[in-house]
């Protein structure tokens, strides 16, 4: 591995992402595929690019990312969290800007478990008075 490489781990819902950044031309590779191929949805691509756009590093860093677990939205959020942590390892002065944008904090919301006797986590079966 390169000596000028920085690492960050990101998590969101049931997804976890490992992000490696190094100076380069702006290539983003996710699970050996490009960002455009991996995420079909434009919103997911925007979420991934958010921290890089905020600190003006979009074309200056190469990203190599492995992500597993969860769905599209969770994976995009995990990647964003990982990129944020890797950027902080790269340059600690970026922390305050990233914190203000809310990217540093891990989104702790998880799926609520299904309860016995209910149809979903909170949805009760229909009540019949008579």
Swiss-Prot record:
HAMAP family, alphabetized: Ribosomal_uS9_B
Record keyword DNA damage present: no
Any GO CC annotation of this UniProt entry: cytosolic small ribosomal subunit
Family: Belongs to the universal ribosomal protein uS9 family.
GO molecular function: RNA binding; structural constituent of ribosome
Domain of life the protein comes from: Bacteria
Pfam families associated with the record: Ribosomal_S9
Keywords: Ribonucleoprotein, Ribosomal protein
Protein name: Small ribosomal subunit protein uS9
One GO-annotated biological process of the protein: translation
Organism listed in the record: Photorhabdus laumondii subsp. laumondii (strain DSM 15139 / CIP 105565 / TT01)
